[in-house]
Amino acid sequence: MARPLEQAVAAIVCTFQEYAGRCGDKYKLCQAELKELLQKELATWTPTEFRECDYNKFMSVLDTNKDCEVDFVEYVRSLACLCLYCHEYFKDCPSEPPCSQ
């Protein structure tokens, strides 16, 4: 049985592969693919009042090489930043883990 971290890594890779390629390059997310991924896979963490300009801004932050797409490295960096944010947020919480083991 896979451990939680192994499952998390597989989920990161599989989620990227599920959404990438609909606009062309199967190794990158275009803005529409990124928007759909955020809305469906991080629905509780993506504000419902996000406007198109918010997605444009988010895309420009993630797209570090400015090719108008998010490659896997840029995607993983964004998830790493999200993990860092969550770690900071939860580090002063009670010692009970936020998820069951």
Curated annotation (Swiss-Prot):
Gene name tied to this protein: S100A3
Binding-site residues for Ca(2+) 2, renumbered to this chain: 63, 65, 67, 69, 74
Keywords assigned by UniProt, alphabetized: Acetylation, Calcium, Citrullination, Cytoplasm, Disulfide bond, Metal-binding, Repeat, Zinc
Modified-residue entries (Citrulline), positions: 51
Pfam families linked: S_100
All copies of domain EF-hand, residue ranges: 12-47, 50-85
Residues with PTM N-acetylalanine: 2
Domain of life: Eukaryota
Tissue distribution: Skin specific, specifically expressed at the inner endocuticle of hair fibers.
Organism encoding this protein: Homo sapiens
Residues annotated as binding Ca(2+) 1: 28, 33
Cross-referenced SMART domains: S_100
Disulfide bond residue pairs: 30-68, 81-99
GO function terms (MF aspect): calcium ion binding; calcium-dependent protein binding; transition metal ion binding
Name of the protein this chain belongs to: Protein S100-A3
Residues given in the record as Zn(2+) binding sites: 83, 86-87, 93
This protein's record includes keyword Amino-acid biosynthesis: no
Function in brief: Binds both calcium and zinc. May be involved in calcium-dependent cuticle cell differentiation, hair shaft and hair cuticular barrier formation.
Coiled-coil region: none
